[in-house]
């Protein structure tokens, strides 16, 4: 990576501003999945072990008005992080002001402070999300010219807490998580060991047009599953019953198929049901066509076998988007089958592009079998699309 990283800095005795991604799910004030907190530990530990004073910034959820602050405080995160680090995490509970500034000034080497949810600044004019220059300058002033961005999950956004701070410090560098995310995903797409197979699922073609176009140029094969299958089917005149379809994207789907030179591989059967939720009948289609009154909710067994064959010998696999409604046990076989087909390839570099795919791997017990699971759905999608990420572009060149 051509950007400076945290290892390039002298941290001892310095107040180090760090953007992390602690946007974790909470239920009744309890964190239900703390993977993102764990993912930030190597960078935080490196800073404090090298005598730095870590000042952490993160958002949590969306906050547009005062009422949205309920249940969005980072207080539970501070507690969880303190347990993981085995030391106190100072939490003044504010995003600005005299109390926060005093707490930062009182920090000693090796201590950690967590600023309150950066999106609390969105209540008055969306200052965080719109990268308000004064807010970025203020947050930068809390440190000593050093900023570490370790929040890959927001690297595709130009916010005050990443791009704004970067613009107002002497050195803005990548943390270990951001460095690894870029290395795995970008290198997989730009310089893959071949054969390189991409697998794209999810419900909407519209979400992945740019990704499909980029990967058709870079990959040897692009496998399509999930709800967007049926837009591709209908574009070819195949019956789809009541399946999800983006009518306004039929021409796009047809165009992608025509210019794919056979690289784009679609399912050959589906698992269908007579309703999305309160269904009374589930069956496998004879072929591609979905029966009238039914909707496709997963790829079928012939498709799993076809995708297994397409993955044979693959050395690089990037997967983004489940093959079906994996949250329902009736429609998770396709996602499980494809995951198992990926991880059984000898010496394969297997990368999951965050979001629902990551949740599927974790929930279905396959997470530890993959080379890398991204912490950022939107950011990884933009990398797969070949876009430059604002949070990365703002960092200091080596």
Curated annotation (Swiss-Prot):
It comes from the Bacteria. InterPro entries: Phosphoglycerate_kinase, Phosphoglycerate_kinase_CS, Phosphoglycerate_kinase_N, Phosphoglycerate_kinase_sf. One of its GO terms (biological process) is glycolytic process. Substrate binds at residues 21-23, 36, 59-62, 119, 157. Pathway: Carbohydrate degradation; glycolysis; pyruvate from D-glyceraldehyde 3-phosphate: step 2/5. GO terms for cellular component: cytosol. It catalyses: (2R)-3-phosphoglycerate + ATP = (2R)-3-phospho-glyceroyl phosphate + ADP. SUPFAM superfamilies: Phosphoglycerate kinase (SSF53748). ATP binds at residues 208, 296, 327, 354-357. Keywords: ATP-binding, Cytoplasm, Glycolysis, Kinase, Nucleotide-binding, Transferase. The keyword Nucleotide-binding applies. It is found in: Cytoplasm. The keyword Oxidoreductase does not apply. PANTHER family: PHOSPHOGLYCERATE KINASE (PTHR11406), PHOSPHOGLYCERATE KINASE 1, CHLOROPLASTIC-RELATED (PTHR11406:SF23). Monomer. This is Phosphoglycerate kinase. The lineage of its organism: Bacteria, Bacillati, Bacillota, Bacilli, Lactobacillales.
């Amino acid at each position: 990576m051509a950007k400076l990283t945290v290892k390039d800095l002298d941290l001892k005795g310095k107040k180090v501003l760090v953007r992390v991604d602690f946007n974790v799910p909470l239920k009744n004030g309890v964190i239900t999945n703390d993977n993102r907190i764990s993912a930030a530990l190597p960078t935080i530990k490196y800073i404090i072990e090298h005598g730095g004073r870590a000042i952490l910034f993160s958002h949590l959820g969306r906050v547009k008005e005062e009422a949205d602050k309920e249940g969005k405080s980072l207080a539970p995160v501070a507690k969880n992080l303190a347990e993981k680090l085995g030391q106190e995490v100072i939490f003044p509970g504010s995003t600005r002001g005299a109390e926060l500034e005093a707490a930062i000034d009182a920090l000693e080497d090796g201590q950690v402070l967590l600023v309150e949810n950066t999106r609390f600044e969105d209540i008055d004019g969306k200052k965080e999300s719109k990268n308000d220059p004064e807010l970025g300058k203020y947050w930068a002033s809390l440190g000593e010219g050093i900023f570490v961005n370790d929040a890959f999950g927001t690297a595709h956004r130009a916010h005050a807490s990443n791009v704004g701070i970067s613009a107002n410090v002497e050195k803005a560098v990548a943390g270990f998580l951001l460095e690894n995310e870029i290395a795995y995903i970008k290198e997989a797409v730009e310089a893959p060991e071949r054969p390189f197979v991409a697998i794209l699922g999810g419900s909407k073609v519209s979400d992945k047009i740019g990704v499909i176009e980029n990967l058709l140029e870079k990959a040897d094969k692009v496998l399509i599953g999930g709800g967007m299958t049926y837009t591709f089917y209908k574009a070819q005149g195949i019956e789809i019953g009541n399946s999800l379809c983006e009518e306004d994207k039929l021409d796009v789907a047809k165009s992608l198929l025509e210019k794919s030179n056979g690289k784009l591989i679609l399912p050959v059967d589906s698992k269908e049901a007579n309703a999305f939720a309160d269904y009374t009948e589930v069956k496998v289609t004879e072929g591609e066509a979905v029966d009238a009154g039914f909707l496709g909710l997963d790829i079928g067994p012939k498709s799993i076998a076809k995708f297994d064959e397409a993955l044979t010998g693959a050395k690089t696999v990037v997967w983004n988007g489940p093959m079906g409604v994996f949250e329902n046990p009736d429609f998770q076989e396709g996602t499980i089958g494809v995951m198992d087909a990926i991880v059984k390839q000898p010496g394969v570099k297997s990368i999951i592009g965050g979001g629902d795919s990551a949740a599927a791997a974790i929930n279905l017990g396959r997470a530890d079998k993959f080379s890398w699971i991204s912490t950022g759905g939107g950011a990884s999608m933009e990398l797969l699309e070949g876009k430059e990420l604002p949070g990365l572009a703002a960092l200091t060149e080596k």
